[in-house]
Regions:
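Base-recognition residues in the alpha-helical recognition helix of bacterial helix-turn-helix
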Residues: 24, 48-52, 60, 64
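Hydrophobic alpha-helical connector segments
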Residues: 60, 64, 74-104, 158-165, ...
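Amphipathic, non-transmembrane alpha-helical scaffold segments
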Residues: 16, 58, 62, 66, ...
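Hydrophobic alpha-helical segments that form the core
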Residues: 154-175, 188-196
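Hydrophobic alpha-helical bundle segments that form small-molecule/ligand-binding pockets
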Residues: 122, 132-161, 200-205
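Key DNA-contact positions within bacterial/archaeal DNA-binding proteins
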Residues: 45
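Basic, helix-initiating cap at the start of DNA-binding domains
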Residues: 1-26, 30-42, 56
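Short secondary-structure transition hinges
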Residues: 96-141
Length: 205
């Protein structure tokens, strides 16, 4: 029984890996379950054993491939140290993950550039929006902490800076994904983040 469970887990992980590749190559609409099954060298029934539908496979793919990175980044924001340092490390680490973690990078490409606006994905898109709202709330809270611990300037508008951080992150990430050879993100990540925070960090503290 133990071996069967291990084999099933390996098959499920393999299907997710193949699905990530095909979604990246063909887009969500173009990567049918039949094509995924053929590329994974499993039956279509095997896919349905692990996933209820193509939508379920897509949702599980996003969850499985982003969970570790999400937990790491959340831990940085919630961890010890000055708030300004945590905010900067959050952005730096998110850029490094994008540049250095191939699976994370390919997932972002699929979500941003290869997923069409389809009715069947409305629930997933709404979930992504809710996740962004929660992130904005968390960033705003940490920025407020920064004003209290004097690592950020008193006149910083917390909600505005949270939005600006998100826009900065998405702008850099999306542009780099389109032109990865034009900018050494893994080398420049700290530099561009420090520059972004230059006007809001309290250098006197």
């Amino acid at each position: 029984m133990r071996r069967t469970k291990e084999d099933a887990a390996k098959t499920r992980a393999h299907i997710l890996d193949i699905a990530l590749r095909l979604f990246g190559e063909l887009g969500y609409s173009g990567a049918s379950l039949s094509k995924i099954a053929s590329a994974a060298k499993v039956t279509k029934g095997a896919i349905y054993w692990h996933f209820e539908s193509k939508v379920d496979l897509y949702e599980q793919l996003i969850y499985e491939k982003s969970r570790q990175s999400f937990n790491e980044l959340h831990g940085i924001l919630s961890g010890p140290g000055r708030a300004a340092d945590r905010l900067q490390q959050y952005l730096i680490r998110s850029f490094l993950l994008l540049a250095e973690d191939q699976s994370f990078r390919e997932l972002q490409r699929v979500i941003i550039f290869k997923t069409e606006q389809l009715p069947e994905l409305d629930a997933q898109i709404e979930q992504q929006k809710n996740s962004l709202r929660l992130l904005l709330d968390h960033l705003t809270e940490v920025i407020e902490e920064g004003k209290l611990d004097k690592s950020l300037k008193d006149n910083v508008q917390s909600a505005d800076l949270a939005w600006e951080m998100l826009a900065f992150h998405n702008g850099v990430s999306n542009t780099w994904l389109l032109f990865p050879d034009s900018f050494p993100l893994e080398v420049k990540a700290e530099q561009i983040v420090k520059r972004f925070f230059e006007s809001v960090v309290n250098h006197q503290n």
